[in-house]
Amino acid sequence: MEMTMRWFGSNADKIKLSEIAQVPGVKGVVGMIMDIPAGEIWPKERIKALKEEIEAAGLTLKVIESVNIHDDIKIGLPTRDKYIENYKETIRNLAEFGIEVICYNFMPVFDWLKSDLDYRLADNSQTMAFVARDIPANPQEIIDRVQAADGCFSLPGWEPERLSEVRGLFEAYKNVDEHKLRENFAYFLKAIIPTCEEVGIKMAVHPDDPPYPMFGLPRVVKNREDLDWICNVVDSPSNAITLCTGSIAEDPANNVYEIMAEFVKRDRIPFAHVRNIKFLPSGKKDFYEAPHMSKYGSLDMYKIMKAMYDNGFDGYIRPDHGRMIWGETGRPGYGLYDRALGASYLNGLWEALEKTNQ
């Protein structure tokens, strides 16, 4: 297991690589290049510069999150083949610089959705939350909230240039139901996985967040059955999963422990986001993102890590999101301090599992 933290790049992240390098047990960075629009090829010189900058700080770059998928692919438009070819070229370019895993999602319009990016806890820390009654009927209101909250840093999946086209996107997706989205997903996977096999990269899809339909948009990565379908539609180790414990557990019907155990055992989880959530009494699916320690949330983090350890997990992990604590401000979910605490906690659980199984 190799602990990592997400980093958005020196021009898009207030957290410094030197600070990440000081977090005990964190060996690598999950990198991205935020200003390359979906559908365009990632140039080799940009990848090389990113890798060299990270390695100069004493960290590794083995995982990229995310190489966004153009909506024409998800919708199934005739232009999709052009964007798929571009995606293949990006895969080849990333592999040339030692990238092993690409985390991505296949969600229409919104890459993730929360009702509150500044939810106050009793200790006055701030976190992200989802309360169904607070989700407006008009998706533009959600966009306005996000853009007001992101300060000087855009949020991943909510890039301004994409959100400016949101009305047109909803119109474009109006005839895309779950069956059609699944067909388009299969088309994409069948096209790119042979390239991944050639160059040694694993495509690891992130579960839908939340894992159920919103605004009438379909979801196809929402439960164990969907993950099984994905693995079987192209049966290859290169066709993999980023198991996000927070996202998959947002639907209480999903048994995150069994899902983790099964797909680690099947060698389909090269990358994991491990975070805790706390369900609220206001509704069955209402929650906030809790501190990582088990007792503060609704998930048993030891049980999650044990499911990974017992079934031979040998991939990359990151603590995913954190609260804003100790007066820190910045991109919601991506401050330094609470993620550092989460990484240390998860590393401690892993060390305990290793030593009790010697």
From Swiss-Prot:
Pfam families recorded: UxuA (PF03786)
NCBIfam families in the record: PRK03906.1, uxuA
Pathway: Carbohydrate metabolism; pentose and glucuronate interconversion
Cofactor list: Fe(2+); Mn(2+)
Keyword list, A-Z: Iron, Lyase, Manganese
Function in brief: Catalyzes the dehydration of D-mannonate.
Class of the enzyme per the UniProt entry, highest EC level: lyase
Listed name of the protein: Mannonate dehydratase
Catalysed conversion reaction: D-mannonate = 2-dehydro-3-deoxy-D-gluconate + H2O
Membrane-spanning segments: none
Organism: Lactococcus lactis subsp. lactis (strain IL1403) (Streptococcus lactis)
Family: Belongs to the mannonate dehydratase family.
EC number of this enzyme: 4.2.1.8
Molecular functions per Gene Ontology: ferrous iron binding; manganese ion binding; mannonate dehydratase activity
GO biological process: D-glucuronate catabolic process
